[in-house]
């Protein structure tokens, strides 16, 4: 599997390289892995379309299976499909919910109130309990703690994991 990853000259590049070095089945094509706080290649917000232009063009051109784009501090990410299309945070939340529900049947999944119906529909379809919530780290983490949710996602690209004590990663 070939993956192009853009870390926006943030801190994720060196860490991601070490991770991919341990998974020889994955071919990593790095973009902007050298940390540089001036962000010389493009802005750091993956939600801004102008910051995604290059990776959206490169993924299909280089026959990659997937593109991954991180913000500079590494607490948000989004994917680009093999045709170069951006996958919004709520759809990423729905996709990851499927994974968590396979591992934790009937689990609770928290998502932000701005998300489309795709999240709730996916969670229900695969036997989980969807709970929408106020936007923001503190609100999401509290709701996860109160309900025992295994996973949460926001359209901003923040994803939270019970295994990491509700922290976003």
Regions found by a protein language model. Give the residues of each.
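Phosphate-binding chemistry for phosphorylated carbohydrates and sugar-nucleotides
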Residues: 1-169
